[in-house]
Amino acid sequence: MILNCPHFQQQDCVSCQWLEKPYATQLTDKEIDLKRLISPFILQNFTEILPPVQSSQKQFRNKAKMVVSGSVERPILGILKDQIDPQSGIDLCDCPLYPTEFEAIFPILKDFIARAGLVPYNIAKKKGELKYILLTQSRYNQSVMLRFVLRSEQKRPLVERELPNLLAKLPKDSVVSLNIQPQHAAILEGETEIFLTEKTTIEENFNDIPLFIRPQGFFQTNPNVASRLYATAQNWIKDLPIQQFWDLFCGVGGFGLHCAKALQEKNENVQLTGIEISASAIASATQSAAQLQLKNVTFASLDSAQFALNDKGKSPDLVIVNPPRRGIGKPLAEFLNELGTPYLIYSSCNAQTMAKDFEALSNYSLQKVQLFDMFPHTSHYEVLTFLVKKS
């Protein structure tokens, strides 16, 4: 086994399905899967398949999603082996995927749970308050975003009473919030977020691009690989004749900001429009653009497909898409196919739906492909592709 993980050995946690597979074999299997899915679009003497970008094999995750079980005096942070049995809690505080700094933070959180009287939610009895702890770290400055997912606001006064003691033990510039999820269901978070700190974001930095992590906004969980993903996209387009471009499903702006910075170094009039449904992510992207002092950059909280289909402006020179697992879907793919944009960048965490979208992008040729091992020890991977309009 390439990682010493007692939880996998005992089959308590099998999230890393491929833990017994040598890392080189994992990469080869992912490459085979990717080539199989995109084989109809690989053109001889044209499509360049670049070597995969590897990940660290441990401590690569920046985020822990912990189900809280056990008792208020002895909380268990990890998973429930049986979703409906509150006695089946497995403590995963020693998971080898987490950053080393989490090792010191988890005991602090267990102590805080006891002091604030945050009784773990019992799914069988529908009683208790604390459902999950969500912990995210910035690799840039080691600050953390700590979110307590509670059934109600009932324990807020006790949490606030114990907060100064907690903050004194957490890294500088950390963010603490309560998320209220009242439903009796295995839903990770609710809509209400109550910040207990003045700061509401933690700052990450990839390739001198500041990126801001907020609650309820998507952020890649493997920062080392993510930073190389964004840098690669930037490198692919930096010398192209681009006046304006779209970043659809832009999240916190990782792709768009990297590309805008490189393009505006040569031509400050280059325009970027970034579109994302999550208002929280758009607030982060806007904050980054302001800090970078980029001009002609607009981020808007809209549905990416609806924006593209309804836009009556000048056609962009480049469109970047980074959709969720379902892909961009047929209507948007067909629209982009007819739009006639010279260049497309498609980043995907699901090559199967990407290949389906490629079928509708028949006016484009696949020029570059690179696999990024964002999710080691699993069958999942990220893939970055570059498509050009057929002449």
From Swiss-Prot:
Annotated binding of S-adenosyl-L-methionine, by residue = 220, 249, 276, 322
Per the record's keyword annotation, is Protein biosynthesis included, yes or no?
no
Q: Which family does it belong to?
A: Belongs to the class I-like SAM-binding methyltransferase superfamily. RNA M5U methyltransferase family. RlmC subfamily.
Q: Which residues form the active site?
A: 349 (nucleophile)
Q: What class of enzyme is it?
A: transferase
Q: What is its EC number?
A: 2.1.1.189
Q: What does this protein do?
A: Catalyzes the formation of 5-methyl-uridine at position 747 (m5U747) in 23S rRNA.
* Name this protein carries in UniProt: 23S rRNA (uracil(747)-C(5))-methyltransferase RlmC
Q: Which residues bind [4Fe-4S] cluster?
A: 5, 13, 16, 95
Q: Which domain of life is it from?
A: Bacteria
Give the matching Pfam families.
tRNA_U5-meth_tr (PF05958)
Q: Does the keyword Ligase apply?
A: no
One GO BP on record is: rRNA base methylation
Kindly give the CDD domains that the UniProt entry links to this protein: AdoMet_MTases
Reactions performed catalytically: uridine(747) in 23S rRNA + S-adenosyl-L-methionine = 5-methyluridine(747) in 23S rRNA + S-adenosyl-L-homocysteine + H(+)
UniProt keywords (A-Z) are: 4Fe-4S, Iron, Iron-sulfur, Metal-binding, Methyltransferase, rRNA processing, S-adenosyl-L-methionine, Transferase
InterPro entries in UniProt: 23SrRNA_MeTrfase_RlmC, MeTrfase_TrmA_AS, MeTrfase_TrmA_CS, SAM-dependent_MTases_sf, U5_MeTrfase_fam
Q: Which Gene3D superfamilies match?
A: 2.40.50.1070, Vaccinia Virus protein VP39 (3.40.50.150)
Annotated GO molecular function terms are: 4 iron, 4 sulfur cluster binding; iron ion binding; rRNA (uridine-C5-)-methyltransferase activity
